[in-house]
Every structure is written in structure tokens, then in C-alpha cells.
């Protein structure tokens, strides 16, 4: 913590502020809260999470996590399951629980009191879950359905986030950028309004996976796209918001492949193509975010073996492709195109 205090202080001497990544949709399964919940299923900490009884020897509902397989993991020795939108090591926090919310607000204000300048709010549109967490018709051969049906951008999410804002960062001068998957054109402006937005700005992702078919975005379920498609998706939100809202603009992040390989045809993956991509997003209205390595035009890693990939979602997507009839070579090629590890390599000096 001494290092962090020094970083904040030295940054302020230079008229700079530190933004932190704030993850409050879920926590680690090693977190003290979750361990206490497991130790005492009827205790107060169990209410911090989504524990549900299984049904007929199966999970409480048929949600598929974003990293593959059921979004419910069984607690050993019981008939209870816990919900995880992402990996099983990341149990979702129950924001309907008032005590949980108070703990989060206390933690956020503690960091703000230390002098943090603001936050990137991770997976923030997943905080509100559908009441009852019901099953839906399956959307795949595995009999499951995307967890988004019960967890993404649910009614009431804006009211919940406004309470969050008003109890924490909204009380002081801060900068906040929301990772806001699932926002619709009808709700976008209320999140980024310069007058009363939930956040200072949001990342807008509608154009980041044009090559994949929703809502599951399986890497093998691909579609063709054109520069006109990119232009339409890229500009539509900006045209709608006009001068009433503000965006965080990016073409790369830790969840996406490198933009040179992602958006440019093979013959355009050079200095001129990279300069064009940079011009495209640096000239948009908003605050540009340059992802690590993007400033030197880093490329996808394209490893030759699955043994070289670490990302859990990459291995799940690879296995999913194999299960649906793709050869190991075809599945590996999909991984080389889409893996999150493409953006997580050391600097390519």
C-alpha cells in the first residue's frame, strides 16, 4: 500500500490522477466473503451471493457462462449452486443485498479518500439480475442459453447504478468510464449525459465483434462484414448522442484481438493501415484510450499450439468448436483470430 500511496502522490505532483479498475459484479472464490458463505450457508455472507437449490439433480436454471459450460457451480456436499456469469472462480455478487451494497460503497469511498481520480467499472451492466433467474429456451446443442438473458442490462440497472453513483463517486470530482455491454440506443444517453449521466463516459462496443453472430458470439459462428457495416456501427451511437454525451473511444482492449489483425485485410496490415485505424478513432468525439502495445502497432500472437494459450475463454471456445464438428486445425485457427491472449503478450519490441 505504501507503493500505491506514493504513486497517487507523485502523480498529483505532476497534475495527473490514477484511475483504478473496479470489479464489483463478482469477486474471487478465494475472497473472505465467499469463503465465509461456504462455511455458513445460513449466515449473513451467503446473502452476498446467488446461492440456489438445484432442481431434479440439475442446476437451478440453464444459463451458460460467458466462458463456457453452466453458469452454476455446485457446492460440494450440498444441493446448492452458486451463480457465476464468467468463470467458476468468479462468483457473482448479489446487489439486491443491502449489506453487500453498503460494503461496496464503503470500499469505493475508501479509495476515493486516498486520492484515486476515478474508475473503470468492469462488467457494470451485469449487476442487476432477473428476479428468480429463470430458464429460457436453449440456444445451443448443449441445452443451455446465454447467461445474458438473465444478467445483462436488466430492468432496474440504471436505478441501481444511480444509487451507486450518488453514494460514492458522484459526490466528488472524479472520472468514471463504464464497461457497459448491452446498452440500447434508448438507454445509452442516460448513461453518458453531460448533465446527469451515470458515468463520465462509457466504452461503446457495438462495432467490436462484427465478424461474430450474437447473442453467443461463438468464434466459429462467423459472418462477413464490410467497411460500410463498420462505419454504420461506429457512427450511429455518436450521431445519436451528438453533443449531449461523451464516449471512451477505443479499438483495442484486454478482451479483443489486436486491431490491425482484427479490422484490416491481410494486404492492409502495414504502417498505412495502422495509421488509418488510429486516425479513425482518434478523430471521433470522445476520450481516446490507447491500449498497451497499440502505440507500436502490436499484432496478434498466433501461437502454433493450444498449450501456449492461457486464457480460460480461449480454451472453452476451442473445445466448443471441437464439440460442434470443427477439426483441431480449424479450431486453432479460430483461436489465433479471436483469443484474448492476442492482447496479453509481452511488448513486441
Can you say where each PLM-predicted feature lies in the sequence?
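Active-site and adjacent substrate-binding regions of carbohydrate-active enzymes
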Residues: 1-349
Amino acid at each position: 500500500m505504501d507503493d500505491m500511496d506514493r504513486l497517487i502522490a507523485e502523480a498529483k505532483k505532476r497534475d495527473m490522477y490514477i484511475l483504478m479498475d473496479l470489479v464489483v459484479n463478482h469477486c474471487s472464490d478465494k475472497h473472505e466473503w465467499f469463503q465465509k458463505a461456504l462455511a455458513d450457508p445460513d449466515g449473513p455472507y451467503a446473502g452476498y451471493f446467488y446461492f440456489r437449490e438445484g432442481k431434479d439433480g440439475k442446476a437451478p436454471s440453464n444459463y451458460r457462462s460467458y466462458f463456457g459450460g453452466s453458469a452454476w457451480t455446485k457446492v460440494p456436499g450440498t444441493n446448492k449452486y452458486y451463480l457465476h456469469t464468467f468463470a467458476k472462480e468468479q462468483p457473482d455478487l448479489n446487489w439486491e443485498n443491502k449489506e453487500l451494497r453498503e460494503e461496496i460503497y464503503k470500499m469505493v469511498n475508501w479509495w476515493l479518500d486516498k486520492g484515486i481520480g476515478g474508475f473503470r467499472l468492469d462488467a457494470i451492466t451485469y449487476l442487476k439480475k432477473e428476479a428468480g433467474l429463470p430458464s429460457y429456451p436453449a440456444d445451443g446443442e448443449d441445452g443451455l442459453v446465454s447467461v445474458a438473458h438473465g444478467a445483462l442490462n436488466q430492468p432496474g440497472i440504471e436505478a441501481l447504478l444511480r444509487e451507486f453513483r450518488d453514494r460514492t463517486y458522484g459526490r466528488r470530482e472524479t472520472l468514471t468510464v463504464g464497461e457497459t455491454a448491452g446498452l440500447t440506443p434508448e438507454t445509452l444517453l442516460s448513461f453518458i449525459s453531460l448533465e446527469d449521466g451515470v458515468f463520465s463516459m462509457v466504452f461503446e462496443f457495438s462495432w467490436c465483434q462484427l465478424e461474430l453472430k450474437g447473442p453467443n458470439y461463438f468464434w466459429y459462428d462467423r459472418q462477413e462484414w464490410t467497411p460500410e457495416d463498420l462505419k454504420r456501427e461506429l457512427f450511429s451511437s455518436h450521431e445519436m448522442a451528438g453533443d449531449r454525451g461523451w464516449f471512451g473511444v477505443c479499438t483495442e482492449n484486454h478482451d479483443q484481438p489486436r486491431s490491425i489483425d482484427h479490422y484490416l485485410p491481410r494486404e492492409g496490415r502495414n504502417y498505412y493501415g495502422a495509421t488509418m485505424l488510429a486516425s479513425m478513432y482518434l478523430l471521433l468525439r470522445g476520450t481516446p484510450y490507447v491500449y498497451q502495445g497499440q502505440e507500436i502497432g502490436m499484432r496478434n500472437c498466433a501461437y502454433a499450439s493450444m498449450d501456449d494459450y492461457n486464457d480460460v475463454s480461449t480454451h472453452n471456445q476451442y473445445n466448443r468448436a471441437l464439440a460442434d464438428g470443427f477439426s483441431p486445425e480449424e479450431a486453432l485457427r479460430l483461436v489465433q483470430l479471436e483469443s484474448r491472449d492476442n492482447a496479453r503478450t509481452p511488448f513486441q519490441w
